[in-house]
A protein has these predicted regions:
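Rossmann-fold NAD(P)H-dependent dehydrogenase/reductase core
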Residues: 11-193
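Short, Lys/Arg-enriched N-terminal segments with co-localized hydrophobic residues
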Residues: 1-11
């Protein structure tokens, strides 16, 4: 008897890779921030946390899209506590504004799920001049975590979850080594993979 999960209704793969008891824990009174929660793994994560009673902040660039997903979830689960807030991890100013609001509005934060990410983008830079994938997937989340860390510590036992991919290892047939001496492709041809 595996508990029903948010994953049972969407396009995501179905294998259950966690202890089923975790999916029935009462999370009432707890608060989570999930980045990139308007689609994919982030949306499934936000929905599952809400189904278990948590208040979930969907931290997304496209707030209207997140609000549409929230409406769909609440139509099916009227007691779900979800809200959308704007967060663009490609802008450190946006990260600072988001964290400032969270710190001002909430007295506790039980979990931060750093899920948002971009992959195989054309060569672009963030608002702050960093290569887009490094800026969004790493630097934006690093700053967000740093700015919410005191709130997370005060809410202990809290958690920080960093979602990643196996592509770091596979690199689509490439050697997979991170070129730390040229992270921003200043001396070599850009490769989105």
């Amino acid at each position: 008897n595996v508990p029903k999960t948010a994953n049972d209704e969407g396009p995501m793969p179905k294998p259950l890779l966690c202890d089923p008891a975790l999916l029935t824990r009462d999370l009432s009174g707890r608060r989570y921030v999930v980045t990139g929660a308007n689609a994919g793994i982030g949306l499934v994560t936000a929905k599952q946390l809400a189904l278990q009673g948590a208040h979930v902040v969907l931290a997304c660039r496209r707030v209207a899209e997140a609000e549409a997903r929230i409406s769909e979830i609440v139509a099916e689960h009227p007691n779900a506590k979800l809200e959308a807030r704007e967060l663009d991890l490609g802008s450190l100013a946006s990260v600072r504004r988001f964290a400032e609001r969270v710190n001002a509005d909430f007295d506790r934060l039980d979990g931060l799920v750093n899920n948002a990410g971009v992959m195989n983008t054309p060569k672009q830079t963030t608002a702050d001049g960093f290569e887009m994938q490094i800026g969004v997937n790493h630097l934006g989340h690093f700053l967000l975590t740093e700015l919410l860390l005191d709130l997370l510590k005060r809410s202990a036992p809290s958690r920080i979850v960093n979602v990643s991919s196996c592509f770091h290892d596979k690199a689509m047939g490439r050697d997979g080594d991170v070129k730390v001496d040229d992270l921003f492709y200043e001396r070599r041809k850009y490769d989105g993979w």
